[in-house]
Amino acid sequence: MSGFLLALRTTFGFLSTIPVGMSMEGLDELVKRSYLQTFAGIVLGSMIGIFAYLTESFLPSTISAVLIMVFIYYITGLNHLDGLGDFGDGATAHGSLEKKVNALKDMSLGIGGVSYTVLALIALYASISSLQAEVLFFSDNAALIIAISLLIAEIGAKQAMLTVAAFGKPIHEGLGSMIINNTTFPRYAVSFVLGALVCVLAFGTLGIIGYISAIVTAFVILNISIRHFKGINGDCIGTSNEIARIIVLMVLTVAITAVNNGYGGLFWTPL
């Protein structure tokens, strides 16, 4: 198998629950091709969007929102949510830098991690529900708009991870440091352009607004990580995935409302 195909297979093995397998050789090839993570976001986001379109078309909104959340974690797995929990433990730990880093790396889940995880799940549900309410009120294409918004959110989530990796410094050796050390600016730029292009094609101006909000979120997570841990690890990268997805959906909800109320002169045209 060529290096590219091995990296492609590993991308989905690493970022999803699709049973394609994963190996250290594949990870070595993947970190050389960071843009494949954004490509995975496009594919996974499309799958989530299609699922959301079907549930929005045939089921009540509340049930649809819950099922969308279930499908997101069914297809993407819980690794990044677990990273958010570890990040919460580290960020809320009191004491020295060493204690914070130890809490970040600790395999057990504390009250800080539980709180961050629960709040993130509540926020994800709230963001999906708010998006549903706005598009149902303003548009006859509600299911399509929700599907496209979820696509952009997933692309943004994956680009947020690459942003943290590209601009952060590792605090210890491991899988996270492999990704961080190999996410060079040229590789990051390729993934950034790929993600931006798809978001613009899918949702016009609103697409790029949502995408940029994910990048901004990543820099906020990076800043918090540096303040607490003096660097980043894989948990910090995973945290950016979870938080960016939520922020993109919230920003798109606000932007869609503004557009439909006639503010800002923004226009969007779903494909």
Curated annotation (Swiss-Prot):
Where does it primarily localize? membrane
Q: Kindly give the InterPro entries that the UniProt entry links to this protein.
A: CobS
Annotated metabolic or biological route of this protein: Cofactor biosynthesis; adenosylcobalamin biosynthesis; adenosylcobalamin from cob(II)yrinate a,c-diamide: step 7/7
Q: Where are the transmembrane segments?
A: 4-24, 35-55, 58-78, 108-128, 135-155, 192-212, 246-266
Supply one GO molecular-function term.
cobalamin 5'-phosphate synthase activity
Q: Which Pfam families match?
A: CobS (PF02654)
The cofactors named for this UniProt entry are: Mg(2+)
Topologically, how does it sit relative to the membrane? Multi-pass membrane protein
Q: Which domain of life is it from?
A: Archaea
Gene Ontology process terms (BP): cobalamin biosynthetic process
Keywords assigned = Cell membrane, Cobalamin biosynthesis, Magnesium, Membrane, Transferase, Transmembrane, Transmembrane helix
Which protein family is it in?
Belongs to the CobS family.
NCBIfam families hit by this protein: cobS
What role does it play? Joins adenosylcobinamide-GDP and alpha-ribazole to generate adenosylcobalamin (Ado-cobalamin). Also synthesizes adenosylcobalamin 5'-phosphate from adenosylcobinamide-GDP and alpha-ribazole 5'-phosphate.
By what name is this protein known? Adenosylcobinamide-GDP ribazoletransferase
